[in-house]
């Protein structure tokens, strides 16, 4: 009884803050991107484990090396070219700019550009993982690395820019939920071609 009375007294004297500062929004949005990126990275690691289970025992180490190398190559290429290619699309356009990305975000943008880059990089790696699983034991490692670089620097950023970068799909009212079309459609089409 005493606890209920004290809870009523305390709650009547306290006021909840209804708005959050720009800095608080920046921190929480950036943290959300980082957490989401880590979860997508675990998904890509799961693809590696699935792929390792689907191949013969002698190919498991090659599959693991292919997935680690894919992460390194995709991250570097997406940083150098892919991010600006995806987000540099003019409104209703098709292709962004071929420039090296620099983070120009501040508290007014609502999130850190690096957190968004990390999140999107994990999606690039997941897209390449779809292809990796489809061509397991049917492609040598170096041609796959070349393909992963092309996928991270050209193919995926262009299709990503059509929606998330404000391109022609976004202008047409297309709605994509968490990459269900962009990531899996692009990865599936590339896997089918492979």
Model segments located where?
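Hydrophobic alpha-helical transmembrane bundles of multi-pass membrane proteins
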Residues: 1-194
